[in-house]
UniProtKB/Swiss-Prot annotation:
It comes from Gallus gallus. One of its GO terms (biological process) is regulation of transcription by RNA polymerase II. This is Homeobox protein Hox-A2. The lineage of its organism: Eukaryota, Metazoa, Chordata, Craniata, Vertebrata. Residues 76-86, 106-124, 255-265 have a biased composition (Low complexity). CDD domains: homeodomain.
Amino acid sequence: MNFEFEREIGFINSQPSLAECLTSFPPVGDTFQSSSIKNSTLSHSTLIPPPFEQTIPSLNPGGHPRHSGGGRPKASPRARSGSPGPAGAPPPPEYPWMKEKKASKRSSLPPASASASAAGPACLSHKDPLEIPDSGSGGSRRLRTAYTNTQLLELEKEFHFNKYLCRPRRVEIAALLDLTERQVKVWFQNRRMKHKRQTQCKENQNGEGKFKGSEDPEKAAEDDEEEKALFEQALGTVSGALLEREGYAFQQNALSQQQAQNAHNGESQSFPVSPLTSNEKNLKHFQHQSPTVQNCLSTMAQNCAAGLNNDSPEALEVPSLQDFNVFSTDSCLQLSDAVSPSLPGSLDSPVDISADSFDFFTDTLTTIDLQHLNY
């Protein structure tokens, strides 16, 4: 009793590990351990090991099965099935499905994934499957699903009509194409992402095309502005030239009127001579002018008739002169010819020609519309 009590106290204080607890019990499994070893050696002597389990490194223990103290019954089936042969046994043969694996395969591979990888190429398409690392477990790898042309065609048809599948339709397609529901769901997810990338690329290309197209209207607008500037510049030069011509004609007309007025006011005795000389000069000047200048002069004459030159008293009376256009050009010329040569004799004639009427005729000759004059 004292020995057992001290042993319990020491067990509680020391807190031994599980192995020490197992060794504290009396050895019961010596006969079982020897029998399990004998059975394992006998099983390897037959030389009919299961090839699949021997080729997986994770199922092959490094040495004899370790049994601490007494062997447990749960470890015996694993020792029987996966215990290695003797040291001089030949290595297991390599199968074709082993060569398809990558050389950098890790030693830890669960039996479920191994069995799925073994059955995967047989139940899927004729294409060589490719392995991709599984994100869930670092060491385990799963095979990439390779779809046949028929499966891809049917899936593409369904995706054309429906981007998203309800669960009953997904189950129906999976049963029709001999696929799992998860494979159909993953394929549709990937296809939606691909469709999204394609649409984004098209939008970017369209945006770049619009940006390039927007540059051309800017250039066209700049060209239009340049053309407008050139047109306005040319129009300004032409209008300036026309204004200069009109101003020159207006100055000539005003000068002739000023000379006539000065002759009438300053030299009362010689008034018949000076207006006639100025009139003859104007007539000679008009005969040598071009049609463009004649039009300009006619325009300026009309402006004078409208009262542009408000300084001279004759211009104020010009609107009333338009009523006297009934005189023909021949009569006016005959009148001027009749007055100019026989000017001294006209003083003694019974017809009384006053200075005002003579000045009126000279003003009429200088301001008449040139379109009615035929020289």
